[in-house]
Amino acid sequence: MDDKHLAWFLGPKAENSELFVDTLMAIIQDYIHWRRNYYPSDNLLITKRMQREHEEEHDKLYQNVTEMMSLLRRNFPFYSPRYIAHMLSDVSMPSMLGYFAGMLYNSNNVTPEAAPVTVEWEIEACNEILKMLGFKPAPTPPKKDASKKDWEVYERELKSQFGWGHITSGGTVANIEALWVARIVKYFPLAVQEVAKTKGLSIEVKKPGAKPTDEPNKIDELSKYEIVNIKPNESIYLYAKFVDAVKQANQNTEIDKVGEIASDWLSKSKYGVGAHLGKVFSEFPPVIFTSGAAHYSVKKAADILGIGRNNVVVVKTDSQFRMDVKDLELKINQALDQGKVPLAVVAVGSTTEEGAVDPVHEILDLREKFQNEKDISFWLHVDSAWGGYIASLFRLEEEEEVSIILDKILFQLNILDSKPLSLGEKIQLILNSFENDTIEVAKEADNQSNKVETAETSKETDTKFEKEDASVLRQTLEGYGGRLDSLSYWANVKDYLSFISELKKLIVDFGTKISFKKNRDAIEKLSDSKIFELSITDRSDETSEYVSDKITIKLNNHQEERLIKWGGKPLISSFLAFKNVDSITVDPHKMGYIQYPCGVVAFKNDRVRHFIMQRAPYITSSSHNALIHNPPRHIKNIDFKKLKEQNAPYDVYQIGTDAFAPFILEGSKPGAAAASLWLSTKTVPLNRKNHGLIIRSSLLAARELYEWLNSWNKFAEKALGKNLLYEFTTFGAVPDTNVVVFAIKDKNNETINGINKLTEQVYNYFTIQAELGDKQHSYSQPFFISKTKMEHNYYNFDSFEGFFNDCNLRSAKREYIEKGLTVLRATIMNPYISSIRQKTDQNLVKEFIIELHKASQSSARKLIKEEEE
């Protein structure tokens, strides 16, 4: 297992402390130099004499700091691999150092005027997160010495759709902001339609079920119900169409003035965003759909946005705690029958309680079904605050993608090797295979020529066809040889995507003509298949292979070898579908291993900024209107048409950076969070080879714990030679991510109440109840876990029916509805657990299981004794 990720953390025993301290001191020294170098001729204020006079105050500060550090020691050891309770873990050294450096400068990231450096870092870092999630980031302005082609690409990219993301204080604010945008985008077309009718504007839109070839509809010809249910992206681009129509109605008016007129007209509409919501909500009451496993912030958002928590419809979950898409379809249809409109569906990309991932790909299919069959669409938001960074596993570098494709080609050509091959070796095998074919074809051409010569000498046969065959073979061989030379060139310069592209063309154009004997059938398969692309099956198979490990479950003289893997096609399909949703929440301060507070909200279409923009006269920002659409960082006032006509130098233009403040829900926000995220992302890129290593380690540790829990009941009785008074009970399928939920069943009390009592008792062994005023230190606590309660209002009985049947519980349904089910929860995000097992002779998962066994056996005895008394 690659342990490179251990270089990015301080270590469970602060093993990397020397590097950390040295770098921290370098940051402090540089900061001090920065202060001293600004107007160095200014007078010193605090003299040595004054410092001596201030010794009492300095002593007080030092004493208070000492007291503070003493009190902080009562903290839970979140950094330790023994802490597996809540979504807390060690944070990376880049994030700590970045936060500390950014904190010293204390910039306010609302605007470049208050944060000239960290605002740019936030844009940079969030662009990397957009890429990780599958969204396209805004184009980066070319450098001054860029080529004309680079500028042409930049101009073209500006006209395409790209995403936008920014830092929030956390997932709650990110969810609220995403649903705020969804609400505005949903009802915006009503205001445009009303203005278009009163002002005589000509605007066209497409209904959700329209095919690409269908003509659009005039906006004033559609009913209000039809217009309020158009696709989110259609509504977003409607803003630009509206401003363009206003421009046509106000000829010879400056573009900024046109924007003001458009805003004024919209503000006067009774459906406008500035009007009260009573009118629009009474006509078209909104509904948000999410599962019972969703975060409570969804209902909080509904209250804040005036939608009301009662209009958040809870969708059933299946036995793996994933949203039941069939029930979602049923609930949406019920809402439509009641005259309500689906505002948004909030899917969860790893639930807080169980780490479950909703089937986003199936929800997208359902949305398409509603669009095609009922002309109804809705916003799809994914709350992936916890699991968003798992997407780094699927961000492959060019060489990795090409290597997987070459494996498929080698398999088809039946060129197999027992040992792992490098990318270069795979390429050489393919080149050798095709070059061998040229040798065979050349021999065949020679044979044909020899036959002709022999026949002409003997004058026994007509040689016309043999001559043609030999000629065709030689012509084909000549063209084929040139293409092979081209393939070799791309391989030598390591342009692997061009190599694959050329290989595909070669096979399509020459494959069956040139391939000889045994390869011909294989080449025909290559010509007809999508083997040059990575399918969902390919991604699923190779990811499961990458996130796999061999473990040993050993206790006393008994042991079993296990191969553990993470993934599966439904789960991988969900993550890969993120790129097609409208917005995503992801928390760097969770599986990004960044300090709190650092959440991120990401939008697929940057143009949503037009819908939520506020104006603050004290914040300077470039012009924003729907016709001239620039990303947050862009070339100021560039006129590409004029530039081409005058052939002016590109370096006369300046890069402008927009303020965040007008476009976000929050106000002031720390530049330190941006510095932390930027340094972390720059040091640990968000791809499989880097951040993916941390994620891999975490997922495998969770799978190992699940395997121990699932095997323990039978395995332990054999190994220990005695009967257990309890059973560890998991919920069937392996966990979707790195949260492992389980309960402990009392063998002498086969009721839910029995499970709840024993589970609660065991929990007390693994916690310091600070929330109840317990102020003890954590030094003697061997492990920490958390608990949660599954209740009928959020988790339907059907989700647990299989679990209850496996446990042979009596009166399970009635008891569950009355009392709920208490479960233990292990959040395995610590980056050290798997590495400790592999690099040392210690297995912390095994140690935890043994401690859990002791606590369970002891608690079960205690409960038996209480019942006897």
Q: What kind of region is each of these model predictions?
A:
Residues F135, V185-V192, L305-N310, Q334-K340, ...:
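Secondary-structure transition/capping motifs at alpha-helix termini
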Residues V181-V185, D303-R309, P359-L364, F394-D407, ...:
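Short secondary-structure boundary/capping segments
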Residues G355, L406-E440, E466-S515, R520-N738, ...:
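Active-site C-terminal subdomain of aminotransferase-like
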Residues D383:
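Glycine-centered flexible beta-alpha turn that most often forms the glycine-rich phosphate-binding loop
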Residues K464-K467, S471, R483, L487-S488, ...:
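PLP-dependent enzyme catalytic core of the Aspartate aminotransferase-like
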Residues G721-C807:
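Conserved PLP-binding catalytic core of the aspartate aminotransferase-like
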